[in-house]
């Protein structure tokens, strides 16, 4: 039996940077707006970030000296209208953040959408597929803690005893997850033990 967890970040990835106004390192988050300069059909585009403690802003470069003919029309429209989904997309775009030497701060919250069969029995072995919708600062361990309602210590004991298999603690702790699918196995009892779901015995 297969259960699918689709994991999606909530909000934005914060960036740590010295704020000249606060005169200390602060967290910055996207303001929700883009800055676009156009000169002779050449575009410069930035995402505007704002200090979480004051109104100081900092621009992260998205496109530099880009000819208008080379940008997708729909993307250009989304940039011009400060589309919220596009702001979030670039907030998690690793290539963009690296190019701007952005220092990541903290780990975003996330939601998990779960899909599983209507029929499930207590002694079944369950294959869990974790789908990361976009790359962000999260570990499989954090996802398991939330979904199984177990502590890190309890999960470690389940891995060591074989109740959770197909994955190691090293893999669970890694925060370098890509937008891909990860799989492991566990018993139906372990999956639903803390969820107040009664499983039938057949």
Which ranges hold each PLM region?
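Residue-level signature for short turns and capping positions that connect secondary-structure elements
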Residues: 56, 171, 189-191
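Extended interfacial segments that mediate partner engagement and assembly in macromolecular machines
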Residues: 69-131, 137
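N-terminal cysteine/histidine-rich coordination modules
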Residues: 1-86
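A basic, amphipathic helix-loop patch mediating RNA/tRNA/ribosome contacts
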Residues: 132-186
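A structural detector for beta-sheet-dominated domains
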Residues: 52, 61, 131-133, 187
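A generic structural signal for beta-strand entry/edge sites
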Residues: 44-48, 125-127, 181
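Long, intrinsically disordered, low-complexity Ser/Thr/Pro-rich regulatory/activation regions
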Residues: 182-202
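N-terminal short leaders/motifs
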Residues: 1-8, 130-138
